[in-house]
């Protein structure tokens, strides 16, 4: 499946299923279009680097659907949680010490001990993140 589709509920559900099956999906955020995959699928994450021609030492941004999900990925102190709850969803990106040690996340984070996390404001992006569960 390829092409440009309206960001309606049916197509967002289809895109979420593509992500769950290891495929890449382009999606809108409030600032740019992103190329997304599951942070738990190393092959899909490697596909993002390949598709973008991105060097492996340049970490990707992980997107979440809710501010309270931040603590699941990063060692977020009270200041970070306060800022996340105040400004997310929106164009604020955190770089924090990471918590999860799965191999795919090693790729996402370019081997660093930090993770870059954002909660986009765009409704289609949020719904895609929620439905894909990643």
What role is predicted for each listed range?
Residues 1-134:
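Active-site-adjacent structural elements in enzyme catalytic cores
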């Amino acid at each position: 499946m390829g092409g440009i589709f309206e960001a309606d509920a049916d197509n967002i559900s289809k895109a979420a299923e593509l992500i769950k099956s290891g495929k890449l999906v382009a999606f809108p955020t409030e600032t740019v279009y992103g190329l997304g995959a599951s942070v738990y699928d190393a092959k899909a994450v490697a596909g993002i680097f390949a598709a973008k021609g991105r060097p492996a030492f340049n970490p990707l941004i992980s997107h979440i659907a809710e501010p309270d999900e931040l603590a699941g990925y990063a060692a977020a102190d009270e200041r970070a949680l306060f800022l996340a709850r105040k400004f997310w969803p929106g164009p604020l990106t955190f770089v924090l010490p990471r918590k999860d040690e799965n191999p795919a996340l090693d790729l996402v984070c370019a081997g660093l001990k930090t993770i870059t996390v954002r909660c986009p404001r765009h409704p289609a992006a949020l719904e895609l993140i929620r439905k894909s569960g990643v």
